[in-house]
């Protein structure tokens, strides 16, 4: 949104749920959630998952972090590329080889990417980001949107009705497709009007 350029700064942090949340990705749960995502983004493409299911998403977090070290724009584009590889192409984002393939396909600087990806620095960084999120800001799930002082922002979402682990129905969606941009604008406006919390010392 160009109207907020230079006024609002958005910083992404990793929060691997398999480490700081409820464990590794659950295939059955995610397959149910795809229907919610399909309703939210009618033009999105989803491919049925194959037997080659990722047992971890840490390589994907690491790869995205490595791309962000090249630039924020490259990082955000590559983060989206990873999501498309998983949801639209059915690729196993838990495999390091797949992440390297995606990096090559995206024409990233492979020397730069591989250095961080292979020396353990990326893993250390994302685990530290997740730890701070949980311990300092009490993050419990994703996505969590917050201001620099820890104030959490929320916008309306559609909640599913779940019975015996199955999604039976979904509430009315507050927005769909590009219509959700307005919700994002509302979040940015709240950020601009927000007065940071003051530290009270006794």
Region locations from a protein language model:
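Structural alpha/beta surface segment adjacent to cysteine/selenocysteine redox centers
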Residues: 1-90, 95-96, 167-173
């Amino acid at each position: 949104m160009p109207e907020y350029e230079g006024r609002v700064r958005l910083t992404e942090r990793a929060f691997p749920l398999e480490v700081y949340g409820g464990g590794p990705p659950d295939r059955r749960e995610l397959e149910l959630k795809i229907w919610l995502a399909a309703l939210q983004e009618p033009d999105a493409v989803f491919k049925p998952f194959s037997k080659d299911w990722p047992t971890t998403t840490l390589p994907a977090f690491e790869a995205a972090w490595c791309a962000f070290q090249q630039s924020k724009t490259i990082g955000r584009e590559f983060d989206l590329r990873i999501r498309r590889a998983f949801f639209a192409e059915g690729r196993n984002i838990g495999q390091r080889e797949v992440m390297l393939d995606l990096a090559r396909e995206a024409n990233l600087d492979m020397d730069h990417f591989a250095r961080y990806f292979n020396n353990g620095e990326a893993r250390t960084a994302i685990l530290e980001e997740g730890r701070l999120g949980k311990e300092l800001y009490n993050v419990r799930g994703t996505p969590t949107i917050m201001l620099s002082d820890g104030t959490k922002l929320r916008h309306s979402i559609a909640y599913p009705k779940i019975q015996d682990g199955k999604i039976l129905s979904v509430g009315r969606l507050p927005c769909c497709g590009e219509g959700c941009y307005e919700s994002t604008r509302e979040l940015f406006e709240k950020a601009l009007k927000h007065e940071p919390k003051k530290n009270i010392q006794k």
